[in-house]
């Protein structure tokens, strides 16, 4: 059997020494991965990274351009000049928030209607919202018509003015109307202040002056230091009413002056005002009521209120007639009011009744106190003495008073 098969040539075994000095470069078809990364990584990686970044920036710019086209025109006109990418994103966020809020309101309405509940808003508010929605639709249609047929562009000043005017009108329609005569928070503030100081007034002051006079306009009192004048008493007008009692037991605080020469008027005493002309028979539609503090009257004129005052401190606040006479005359008082006041206060009849030769000019122009005051009359020389006295001095009446023996100056 071995004879039929030709003998194969015996394979010659090559030893290691036979391969020394031979070049086998053709046998290696590729390089290992490590050597590939070391050599070609820098050049092959830069190109894909640049392409990826460019594609990413292009996508961002394309999306921002689409958002800019989808924005409403009134949002675009809020900023002048070129719309930057950040501005476009901010306007888009603002618009999305508004749409989200509107969607939430509509969703709540739908749920309320499904549950059979009444509308969340009043019919007036619902009609106002519907009108505002229609107003916005009409404004948008006007802008589209001007841009299409009149060739108006959003960058033109007249277009911007038109849009601003329409939005201003829409804002006025949404805001509630406020009465121009009185602010919304004025009455609650005055009521709160009166309620807060009510207990303090009861503790150390005379009864509050209540005024109920519907025919006259509310005006400020001439003496605002009494605590009853000012804006808190604007809506009320009436004659002082003091209930029977003995409020003299209430504690009174005396304010000492810095110099110590003269005690200042107490707030409780300043609050006690003689209201002449507040009600009938002194009520006049044209003449405003006037008030006179006690310390401007002689003790005899204020005798009817002495039971309510502290006898010990009365001489400190009321000027004696012999020391400093105060001729009183109000030019705005009518003849009937002056006669009634003279009958009520006999000691003032000489100064309230006009002289017979000048009866026709009793309500003449007022005179300033510093122009017609007699040189012999004495005034309180104190740093905190009043300079805004609510009366004027008549020279004739002052001369008549000077002749009386009870009122001679020392």
From Swiss-Prot:
SUPFAM superfamilies reported for this sequence: HLH, helix-loop-helix DNA-binding domain (SSF47459), Orange domain-like (SSF158457)
GO biological process, one term: negative regulation of transcription by competitive promoter binding
Keywords tagged on the record: Biological rhythms, DNA-binding, Isopeptide bond, Nucleus, Repressor, Transcription, Transcription regulation, Ubl conjugation
Disulfide feature: none
Cross-link Glycyl lysine isopeptide (Lys-Gly) (interchain with G-Cter in SUMO2) per UniProt, renumbered positions: 31, 121, 240
Tissue expr: Highly expressed in the caudate putamen, pineal gland, granular cell layer of the cerebellum, olfactory bulb, piriform cortex, hippocampus and hypothalamic nuclei. Moderately expressed in skeletal muscle, heart. Weakly expressed in lung.
Name assigned to this protein: Class E basic helix-loop-helix protein 41
Induction details: Expressed in a circadian manner in the suprachiasmatic nucleus (SCN) of the brain.
Stored PANTHER family: BASIC HELIX-LOOP-HELIX TRANSCRIPTION FACTOR, HES-RELATED (PTHR10985)
Highest classification ranks of the organism: Eukaryota, Metazoa, Chordata, Craniata, Vertebrata
Annotated compartments: Nucleus
Quaternary structure note: Homodimer. Heterodimer with BHLHE40/DEC1. Interacts with CIART. Interacts with BMAL1 and RXRA. Interacts with NR0B2 and HNF1A.
Region (Disordered): 209-251, 371-410
Ranges for domain bHLH: 44-99
């Amino acid at each position: 059997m071995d004879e039929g098969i030709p003998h194969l040539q015996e394979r010659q075994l090559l030893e290691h020494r036979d391969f020394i000095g031979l070049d086998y470069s053709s046998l290696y078809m590729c390089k290992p991965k490590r050597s590939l990364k070391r050599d070609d990584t820098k050049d092959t990686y830069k190109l894909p990274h640049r392409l990826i970044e460019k594609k990413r920036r292009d996508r961002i710019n394309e999306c921002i351009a689409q958002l800019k086209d989808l924005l409403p025109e009134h949002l675009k006109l809020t900023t002048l000049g070129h719309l930057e990418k950040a501005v476009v994103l901010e306007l888009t966020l603002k618009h999305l928030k508004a749409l989200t809020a509107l969607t939430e309101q509509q969703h709540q309405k739908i749920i309320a209607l499904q549950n059979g509940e009444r509308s969340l808003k009043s019919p007036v508010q619902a009609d106002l919202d519907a009108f505002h929605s229609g107003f916005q639709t009409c404004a948008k249609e006007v802008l589209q018509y001007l841009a299409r047929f009149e060739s108006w562009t959003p960058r033109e000043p007249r277009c911007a003015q038109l849009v601003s005017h329409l939005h201003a009108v829409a804002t006025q329609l949404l805001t509630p109307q406020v009465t121009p005569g009185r602010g919304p928070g004025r009455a609650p503030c005055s009521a709160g202040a009166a309620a807060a100081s009510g207990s303090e007034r009861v503790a150390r002051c005379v009864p509050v002056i209540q005024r109920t006079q519907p025919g006259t306009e509310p005006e400020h009192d001439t003496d605002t230091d009494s605590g009853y004048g000012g804006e808190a008493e604007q809506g009320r007008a009436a004659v002082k009413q003091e209930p029977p009692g003995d409020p003299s037991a209430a504690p009174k605080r005396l304010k000492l002056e810095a110099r110590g020469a003269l005690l200042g008027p107490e707030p409780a005493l300043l609050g006690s005002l003689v209201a002449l002309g507040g009600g009938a028979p002194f009520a006049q539609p044209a003449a405003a009521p006037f008030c006179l503090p006690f310390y401007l009257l002689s003790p005899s004129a204020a005798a009817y209120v002495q039971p309510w005052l502290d006898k010990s401190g009365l001489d400190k606040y009321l000027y004696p007639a012999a020391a400093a006479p105060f001729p009183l005359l109000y030019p705005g008082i009518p003849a009937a009011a002056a006669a009634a006041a003279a009958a009520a206060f006999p000691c003032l009849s000489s100064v309230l009744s006009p002289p017979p030769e000048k009866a026709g000019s009793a309500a003449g122009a007022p005179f300033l106190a510093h122009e017609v005051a007699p040189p012999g009359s004495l005034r309180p020389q104190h740093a905190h003495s009043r300079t805004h006295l609510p009366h004027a001095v008549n020279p004739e009446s002052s001369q008549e008073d000077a002749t009386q023996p009870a009122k001679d100056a020392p």
